[in-house]
Amino acid sequence: MRGGIRDSPVKRELLKQLRRKDVVSGDEIAQRMGISRVAVWKHIKELNMLGYEIFSTPKGYVLIREAYKPYPWELDFEVYYFKEVWSTMDIAKELAEEGKENVFIIAEKQKGGRGRLGRNWISQEGGLYFSLVVRPKISLKDVDKLVFPISSAIVEILDEYGISAEMVSNGDIFVRNKKLAGILIEAEGEIDLLEYAIIGVGVNVNNPVPEEATSLKRELGKEINLLEFTRVLFLRINHHLLKTIF
């Protein structure tokens, strides 16, 4: 797989320690993790470049601000994370052809994000754009059955945010007749056996949207914690897929 941001056990543990205490010394972090202080400094520098604010003080490191982005080390799933791609669907297809399954591909922005019927899906920063590779034991003709558990998970979470949403059979999610999310499914296989399916999802969260669409931010009048939204959605998607398909 080319490029992208992959999971980092070091960053995962480093953030865990920084969240435990107000100040953590470089020596303490290095000893706990079995790495050098230089390695600690390098990871701190990388995290700062990714949107976290970690200050260095005479007593040690202090986590001032979270990035609130769904980086791989913030989630309990296998995730490939990209700042910008042409389409997460294309990367998902590459991974599927390599034999991957149950893997999420997330992008902050897409240059060629696509929706149903070849339509363009505008993918500006602030939204949630991802593809999921799955290999359910169903026939190719039944692949559309994957839409319902995904759309159900989205509607369920929106309801918890106080947003009443309606899902249509093609997977689009509407709020007050304005589109908030969409689902695209592409698959490979034989008539009686699905080799793999790629579920593409776009959710307008904090990103700017045209007047005919809407977003969580527009509906609620405030910015949403994108990491928390993603974390809960992925858990719900996993639950709904396991319950209805696998």
Place the predicted regions along the sequence by residue.
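A short coil-to-beta-strand element that immediately follows conserved catalytic motifs
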Residues: 103-104, 164-169
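Generic recognition of long tandem-repeat/solenoid scaffolds
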Residues: 63, 173-175
